[in-house]
């Protein structure tokens, strides 16, 4: 009998239920009137005004921490200058051969880079504001900087001079050897002629 009474009683939880302490014992749902159930549901649940939520939390102008960049794209400028054709690669679909490349390099070698000419133009304007000591320091600095940046050119020139000197030395040695060889040939021929003269004198005298 204890088993049958235990099956009809609801299982009690550890936590106290506020409604169970104040309300009368639980009556099966068939005996309860309907309005009480709706009343309990309205107390426990909330009604959401979805249009109000959309208007409040999702306005059209809200960016949610994301930035919109309204800048135009950075423009790309081709090289601007007088000798654009010397540096441009837009001569049709012309194939770059070593001869053409050598001609272009030779044409570009004599001209000074554009950034250096711009630096020189701008430095002339700045010199007017400096004292004589500062001008002298700046002049020395620029001179040292030019020497440093032109060091590669100086190395090329030094190599050319060294190779030219070596080539000249080789030619001098060859000329000295040929001169020595010629003098030896002259001596041999003169010795040969003297011996032939002696032989002729001997043959005539005998």
UniProtKB/Swiss-Prot annotation:
Annotated region (Required for binding PPP1CC catalytic center, displacing metal ions and inhibition of PPP1CC catalytic activity), positions in chain: 148-151
Modified residues (Phosphoserine): 45, 88, 90, 122-123, 131
Positions of the UniProt region annotated as Required for binding PPP1CC: 12-17
Chain intervals for the UniProt region annotation (Required for binding the 'RVXF' binding groove of PPP1CC): 44-56
Region Disordered, annotated ranges: 1-36, 75-143, 164-206
Record field: compositional bias (Basic and acidic residues): 111-121, 132-143
Superkingdom of origin: Eukaryota
Compositional bias per record (Acidic residues), positions renumbered to this chain: 81-92, 122-131, 168-180
Keywords: Acetylation, Carbohydrate metabolism, Glycogen metabolism, Phosphoprotein, Protein phosphatase inhibitor
Protein's UniProt keywords contain Transmembrane helix: no
Quaternary structure note: Heterodimer with PP1.
Function statement: Inhibitor of protein-phosphatase 1.
Annotated protein name in UniProt: Protein phosphatase inhibitor 2
């Amino acid at each position: 009998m204890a088993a049958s009474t235990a099956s009809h009683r609801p299982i009690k939880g550890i936590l106290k239920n506020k409604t169970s302490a104040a309300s009368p014992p639980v009556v099966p749902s068939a005996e309860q009137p309907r309005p009480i159930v709706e009343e309990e549901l309205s107390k426990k649940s909330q009604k959401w005004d979805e249009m109000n939520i959309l208007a409040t939390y999702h306005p059209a102008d809200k960016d949610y921490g994301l930035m919109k960049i309204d800048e135009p794209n950075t423009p790309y400028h081709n090289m601007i200058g007088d000798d654009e054709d010397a540096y441009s690669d837009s001569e049709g679909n012309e194939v770059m051969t070593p001869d053409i490349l050598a001609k272009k390099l030779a044409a570009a070698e004599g001209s000074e880079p554009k950034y250096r000419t711009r630096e020189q133009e701008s430095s002339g304007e700045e010199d007017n504001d400096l004292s004589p000591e500062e001008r002298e320091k700046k002049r020395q600095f620029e001179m040292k900087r030019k020497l440093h940046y032109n060091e590669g050119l100086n190395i090329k020139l030094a190599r050319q001079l060294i190779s030219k000197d070596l080539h000249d030395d080789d030619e001098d040695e060859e000329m000295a050897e040929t001169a020595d060889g010629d003098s030896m040939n002259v001596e041999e021929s003169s010795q040969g002629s003297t011996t032939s003269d002696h032989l002729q004198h001997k043959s005539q005298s005998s």
